[in-house]
Amino acid sequence: MITADIFGSLPDGRCVTKYTLSTHGASVSVMDFGATVLSVCVPDRTGAAADVLLGFGDLAGYLDNPACYGSTIAPVANRTDRAEVPLAGRIYHLPANDGPDHANNLHTDLARGLHKRLWSTELFEDDNAVRFSCELADGELGLPGNRRFAVTYRLDKEAQKTARTGACALKWSMSARPTPRLM
């Protein structure tokens, strides 16, 4: 079963929605801001449901979330040496925001990355799943290529949670460019 509730509002007034996938005493809550996992509640050995995920109780915590708890990080997760991405004979520069003297890059862009965006949502009631998707234009966040990112969260009948991520370069023109992805 999937339920949807307003989780809060962004500073620009757009609503953030929390989706809860439930089955047999377990539940997973996710939100469309950052395609973020909010909670994973599972029965303990006595059968009482408990949230086993580290996170925040309200949207404000996720708006200022330097550890990126629960968030989908893309297009590049983790560190990029010297904040440079060599691709197809060219060097692309990302914000230098991490490491000694802030010489490296962490998570593409901590201020404007996909974990700081409202994603589109598609519900799959029959599969007890929700898919979030987000698009980036060529050059956006410092990387080439028109790109679409998607993550699907599913809680099956046996209370097994799965997450699938994916990205693809979109061929919106004859000059589609290569693009990196590390999610």
PLM regions with names:
Residues 1-183:
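Surface-exposed acidic/polar loop and edge beta-strand patches at domain peripheries
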